């Protein structure tokens, strides 16, 4: 049902938890299914140095939360802003049709985080 990448990120989440010295912290919820994704990041010189996530929800939501942190860590804010839902779906090895919302939740949380980071710089 789920790709090996989804299961790996779910069973062995990367960058899980909260970043105590974060420059920005956001919480985004999908009202249709109740999934919640929180991101916190430390940005210096326009580059994302550290990022953490916490997720409450389905397996794909947790996996996409883990993956998005790997995708943006070390990237510039501009590079992170360019990440789209289809890139997440491809990198995670595909998602069932009914689980596409998980990749969108990750993108929405990332956009909110980057916006908040820009306001705090």
Where are these regions (language model features)?
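Alpha-helical support elements that line or immediately flank enzyme active sites
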Residues: 60, 64-75
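A generic alpha-helix surface/boundary motif
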Residues: 35, 62-66, 82-86
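Short beta-strand elements
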Residues: 30, 35-45
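Short connector loops at helix/strand junctions that flank enzyme active sites
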Residues: 21, 34-36, 48, 63
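Short, thiol/selenol-centered motifs that function as redox-active sites or metal-ligating centers
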Residues: 33, 55-64, 102
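A short interface-forming secondary-structure element
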Residues: 42, 46-47, 51-61
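C-terminal binding/interaction regions
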Residues: 1-20, 25-27, 49, 75-79, ...
């Amino acid at each position: 049902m789920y790709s090996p990448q989804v299961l790996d990120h779910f069973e062995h989440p990367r960058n899980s938890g909260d970043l105590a010295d974060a420059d920005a912290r956001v919480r985004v919820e999908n009202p249709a299914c109740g999934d919640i994704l929180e991101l916190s990041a430390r940005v210096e010189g326009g580059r994302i140095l550290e990022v953490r996530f916490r997720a409450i929800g389905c397996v794909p939501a947790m996996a996409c939360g883990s993956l998005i942190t790997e995708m943006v860590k070390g990237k510039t804010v501009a590079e992170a802003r360019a990440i789209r839902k289809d890139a997440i779906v491809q990198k995670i090895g595909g998602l069932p049709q009914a689980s596409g919302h998980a990749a969108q939740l990750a993108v929405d949380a990332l956009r909110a985080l980057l916006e908040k980071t820009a306001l705090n710089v």
